[in-house]
Design a protein with these regions (language model features):
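Bacterial N-terminal signal peptides that target proteins for export
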Residues: 1-9
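Bacterial N-terminal signal peptides
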Residues: 8-17
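Short, exposed beta-strand "edge-strand" segments with a Pro/Gly-rich flavor and a Y/T-containing core
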Residues: 19-20, 37-44, 124-126
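Boundary at the C-terminal end of the N-terminal hydrophobic targeting segment
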Residues: 21-23, 29
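Short, compositionally biased low-complexity segments
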Residues: 24-25, 90
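Generic signal for short, ordered secondary-structure residues
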Residues: 28, 32, 101-102
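Short, recurring structural edge motifs at helix starts
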Residues: 33-40, 106-110
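A cross-family detector of function-defining hotspots
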Residues: 44-195
């Protein structure tokens, strides 16, 4: 059977679409660049943040206006995270990168730990090993419902503070109406005042 040229363009279009969806998101911002993450700057307005995310080819962009949040997907090394941009008085204040949330007994070791490790390795490669750190915790070590979670790594840099954490919290299950314990890893990127 001969290859039909009529199939070449649709296949090429499909392949390029798959590659763009699987491509890595932008990396962490350089020190002293003035950027929090990617090309997002402290003080960017809601419209500017949305425009930069669209132009940066981020996907699944949505807003929670009542909470001052803009969210989208981030992908690094095959892992999917969620970027949350926190706005205060319509100005970007900080960014939070959150791993997948899960509740199954195997989730913590099989999904959360590799996501956390991927984030840690990216941060060490970018900002160096000079930080406060401790090992990945056992689930029972993670404080339940504490917004700060269990801090595993923190970088106190000239222009930003980075904190990598593991969190545990309860969410009401819509099917059983019972509280279910979830966990995830998070990375807080907080620019320093005046920087």
């Amino acid at each position: 059977m001969k290859f039909q040229p009529a199939f070449a363009f649709p296949l090429l279009f499909l392949f390029s679409g798959i590659v763009s969806v699987l491509a890595d998101s932008p990396g962490m911002a350089d020190l002293g660049s003035g950027f929090i993450y990617s090309d997002l700057k402290k003080g960017d307005s809601r419209e500017v943040v949305l425009d930069k995310l669209r132009k940066g080819s981020f996907i699944q962009i949505y807003e929670e206006r009542d909470r001052g949040l803009i969210k989208c997907s981030v992908r690094w090394n095959g892992f999917r995270y969620e970027l949350t941009c926190k706005l205060v008085d319509d100005k970007l204040e900080l960014c939070l990168i959150e791993g997948q949330k899960g509740w199954q007994f195997s989730f913590y070791d099989e999904v959360l730990n590799p996501q956390w490790k991927n984030l840690r390795e990216r941060l060490v490669a970018k900002y160096g090993k000079d930080r406060k750190f401790r090992d990945f915790p056992k689930l029972k070590q993670v404080p339940m419902g504490d917004p700060g979670g269990f801090v595993t790594d923190s970088w106190d840099l000239n222009d930003r503070l980075l904190m990598l954490t593991v969190q545990s919290f309860k969410i009401k299950d819509c099917c059983t109406n019972k509280m279910v314990e979830y966990s995830c890893c998070t990375l807080l990127i907080q620019p320093k005042q005046g920087k």
